[in-house]
Regions:
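Conserved small/polar residues in nucleotide/adenosyl-binding loops
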Residues: 145-152
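Charged surface patches that recognize polyanionic ligands
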Residues: 8-14, 18-27, 31-111, 116-141
Length: 156
């Protein structure tokens, strides 16, 4: 079970010392969006992820892939592949902020996620002042949808 909240972050509110935090390079593509079926490369590891419907709480299954399997599925992804750097920032109460900084063509999009052990913990979470809009329960809560909205704004 995945229980998380998501927040948009503005560039001017990003922590100044991002590279001092542990981070990973990610590339991902969506094979399906309803339900979410995603392939992801995280550094030198590869995964197939299934996510059930839901906003703050949903089922999530991560299955390891070989590099060959990932490369085979890559061309089947819907739309372009998404590249980003994920920074792991320690947060109060033993939590971790996963801050995604997207590469082109979505450069300028920053999304923070915080995972919780219970819905009660998630609902009582008071985010840091540098967080922006809470998009957990909006139609924008899925990264894929965020990217489509960001793409539309840049096309105007």
């Amino acid at each position: 079970m995945e229980i998380e909240r998501k927040f948009l972050i503005s560039k001017e509110n990003l922590p100044a010392d991002l590279n001092s935090y542990p981070h990973h390079r990610l590339e991902q593509g969506y094979l399906s969006t309803a339900p979410v079926v995603r392939i992801r490369k995280e550094d030198d590891n590869y995964y197939l992820t299934y996510k059930s419907k839901g906003l703050m709480t949903r089922e999530e299954y991560n299955l390891p892939l070989t590099k060959e399997s990932y490369e085979h599925m890559r061309p089947k992804a819907d739309g372009i592949l998404i590249s980003k750097t994920r920074y792991l920032i320690p947060e109060k109460d033993g939590l971790t902020i996963e801050l995604d900084v997207f590469d082109a063509p979505y450069e300028g999009l920053y999304l923070a996620e915080v995972e919780f052990s219970s819905e009660e913990q998630a609902l009582s979470y008071n985010p840091p002042v540098w967080f922006g809009e809470d998009v957990t329960n909006s139609g924008k809560s899925v990264s894929y949808t965020h990217l489509r909205a960001h793409e539309t704004r840049h096309d105007l």
